């Protein structure tokens, strides 16, 4: 759900980052930062490739320090400045299912409607 709310009309996210989430598929998402103990999913880009290389080529403690240095300011670069090369666009693997920018209201209404439909279907299966 977080990824959907990132792309909401009201979200304070640069339009470039929102469009990157809409274009991304599940295979475009990588997990970075395991060496820090705080891994995160993000869209593969120049920064993500650099972070993955750091993690692959260094001992965990060294990689953690290098990764923190390499990623400093990267969230702001993507979300505020719209720089998709050096910015971290953090989104989950579900981003492939996000196909349009909606208002928060519409996201919540859709969630409620979808949940109601699933509950109705699961109830009839149980009979």
Q: Language model features by range: what are they?
A:
Residues 1-127:
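Conserved active-site-proximal phosphate/metal-binding subdomains
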């Amino acid at each position: 759900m977080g990824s959907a709310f990132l792309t909401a009309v009201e979200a304070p996210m640069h339009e470039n980052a929102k469009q990157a989430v809409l274009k991304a598929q599940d295979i475009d998402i990588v997990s970075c930062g395991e060496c820090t103990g705080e891994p995160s999913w993000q869209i593969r880009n120049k920064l993500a490739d650099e972070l993955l290389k750091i993690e692959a080529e260094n001992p965990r403690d060294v990689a953690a320090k290098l990764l923190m240095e390499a990623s400093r300011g990267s969230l702001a670069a993507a979300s505020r400045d719209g720089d998709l090369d050096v910015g971290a666009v953090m989104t989950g693997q579900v981003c492939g299912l996000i196909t349009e920018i909606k208002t928060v209201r519409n996201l919540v209404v859709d969630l409620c409607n979808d949940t109601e439909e699933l509950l109705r279907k699961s109830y009839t299966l149980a009979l």
